[in-house]
């Protein structure tokens, strides 16, 4: 028998997608912008999120 796969950490983009599914696009965009504001750089995930809105 095979062992089940190990639990994986949720990536940043997966986390944003989950927020988008749970709370909606506006909340996901604000969550993403706050993250980029805190780390002082624009990441690919921010650009993808802003383009989807």
UniProtKB/Swiss-Prot annotation:
Q: Which GO terms describe its biological process?
A: cellular detoxification; detoxification of aluminum ion; detoxification of copper ion; response to aluminum ion
Q: What happens when the gene is disrupted?
A: Decreased tolerance to aluminium (Al), but normal tolerance to cadmium (Cd). Lower Al accumulation in root cell walls and plasma membranes but increased Al levels in root cell sap of plants exposed to aluminium.
Q: Name one GO molecular function term.
A: metal ion binding
Where is it localised? Cell membrane
Residue ranges of coiled coil: none
What Gene Ontology cellular-component terms does the record carry? plasma membrane
Q: How does it sit in the membrane?
A: Single-pass membrane protein
Q: What does this protein do?
A: Confers resistance to heavy metal ions (e.g. aluminium) by chelating them at the plasma membrane of root cells, thus stopping their entry and reducing their accumulation. Binds to and confers tolerance to aluminium (Al).
* Family statement drawn from the similarity comment of this UniProt entry: Belongs to the CYSTM1 family.
What protein name applies here? Protein CADMIUM TOLERANCE 3
The gene name on file is: CDT3
């Amino acid at each position: 028998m095979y062992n089940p796969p190990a639990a994986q950490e949720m990536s940043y983009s997966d986390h944003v997608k989950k927020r988008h599914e749970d709370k909606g696009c506006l909340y996901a965009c604000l969550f993403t912008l706050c993250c980029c504001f805190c780390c002082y750089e624009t990441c690919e995930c921010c650009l993808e999120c802003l383009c989807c809105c």
